[in-house]
Amino acid sequence: MAKAGPGGPDRILGSLHAIPHEGRLTAADDLFRRMPAADVMRRYFAELLRLVEGSDLFQILAHLDFPRRMWPRAAGPYEEQAFETEYRAVLTALAAGDRILEVNTKSPLVSAGLLGWWREAGGRAVSFGSDAHQPWRVGDKFKLAVDVVEAAGFRPGRDRFDFWRR
């Protein structure tokens, strides 16, 4: 795995924002207009699994279910359980590489149940990210994200910069 260190970045995140479709990388919100929402999520998870298994350049996986942020209302409520197999495949591969799962505070969609899957897969730690894009938004909904992480059995690390561990 790539190492962060002196003079370089503290942490290296891996994330996926677009999905291959018809020979091009396509944003999930565009794909939601072209195909059933569940198909978009399954394609996303398949590509995310390829990223996790095929690259050791990152330490933390961000945006575990990024397209969920754009889930169309017409598709009904988003249910993590409908994609449990896909979540578990990604989480198992991530844990096998001794990596960290990010919990995003911008829109903390992750549940204690999903973090339970992370634990069951062998995941040992989580990181918080705000995905703020504006300085004044850093840490929005942090308390909510902490509550979810604690409910899943993760606790603060040695200092405020450390990962939360089980």
Could you describe each region identified by the protein language model?
Residues A74-R166:
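Charged catalytic cores and adjacent phosphate/nucleic-acid-binding surfaces used
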